[in-house]
Amino acid sequence: MDYGYERLQDGNKYLSETVDTDMRNTYSAGIDFSWQATPTSKLFVNSSVNLLAGPGVTATETQVYQGTTTLDGILRARNDYVEQKTLRYSNSLNYLYRPSEKHQLSITADWTRFDGTARCEQPNTYYSATNMLVRSDFFYSQPDKDIDIYALLADYKYKPNDESEWLTGAKTSFIRSHNTFLFEKNGAIDTQRSNTFHYDEGNIEGYTQYTHTLGKLELSAGLRLEYMHTSSKLNAYSSQDGEEHSDSHLRLFPNLSISYALNEQSKVALLYSRRQDKPRYEDLNPFEYLLDELSYWKGNPFLKPQISNKLILSYVWNSLSLNLSYSKLDDYFTSITDALGTTKTVMTTKNIGAQQQVGLEGLFSKRLTPWWDFSANLGLYYFVNKLDYETYKEEYKRPSCLMSVSNSILLPLGLNLELSGRYHSKHQGGSYEVIRPNGSLDIGLSRMWADDRLRLSLLMTDIFHTDRWDNYGHKGALDLTTWFGSESRKVILRLSYSLGKQKFNKVESSLGELDRL
């Protein structure tokens, strides 16, 4: 992939281009086991392992200007990831007890282990405007991450009749993250950048949900009570006394939905939900990852969860559905690029304020003929990002449009043609940046044999190579334009054969902690 930026910082221009080559491979294996001890009870066991490993290289050249036209020097940097490895073990045990149609009890225990390590060698070489060597530095970084996630869930479902259903449950989870980061410059340990970071998180939740149907009216209401405690300790090589931080809070998260069937073809519904989104563990690690000496990424151990409130009014008529929505994020966090001094930039995930969104979405899906399935989606949105953090306060807002179309066409000889496209207009990004228009077009052919167990498919994604992530923005003394293009245009040939039972009736449990890895 290739990416780069042009920035104007305190009146000076920086032009940077990077070629990123990722040579990692993914390996995975898993096993599922089901045992029905009695007609009313079942035991499910799942275990899997996933390994992502291999080298990688980035080559970056940054031109440094005095003002906007006079070239002052060139910085050439190379990130040589001589080792990259992430290993994830997931284990789950589920017991399901269903003595009758009215009662069901489910108990689930989960343990996930995540091990990540990398070794990166990075020479940074400075040249003059006439390409004469000025100086050279050699950086070395070695992050090691160990994360354990333990969770226990219990759900009880009671259905006294066909019109009513109760669901109540409890969940507890514990996360332990131990991280070390070694950073060297020219063979000597940088005691300001090298550190160890410990993070512990405990969660206790209790929840209940009631659903009742009364003729054409359906009502569902729920409440979740969550207690969260976090503690972290950051120890730098240069300090004997670590920096400690802890936080605890107790919060309520209600949800409510009311729907009414106007007739057999149409229905109207109103939905409200409140939830919290917790930061990724990677974003909490205060490690520094250098693109070069002028630009780098850094974690933030002081991130707080963001709180989401969302209201949706929906209408369904035959194959058409319309949704009018409003959402607000408080303590909103996202990755943001800030100026560091007068010559550097740092990208960090921060709680930057609030985000509001109003949206109108339309979805149409229908089998137009016995051989043609068609669906289309159109969304109109208005984003408002209210940045209010540290000493910066500003508001960014912009409308946008998102369109997508999908076709599935049955051809002679049992072939199936799939053609889909997507377009996203210019829109507001996560903070102050504006994303330029982008889109893609995909096409694929497939055929199935042996009672649909054997499948052969040929797919080409992003035919015109237009699925890019280019943006621009302004914040204080920083004007930033960035571009990003990945290997989105691919030709993929897949051959698959399904063995054994096609449907595994396991009770799925929601473990949001895993989504933060």
Show the residue positions of the predicted features.
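Face-selective signature of the C-terminal outer-membrane beta-barrel domain
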Residues: S28-G30, S34-L52, D80-N235, A261, ...
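C-terminal beta-barrel architecture of Gram-negative outer-membrane proteins
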Residues: F383-N385, C401-W449, T461-F464, Y472-G476
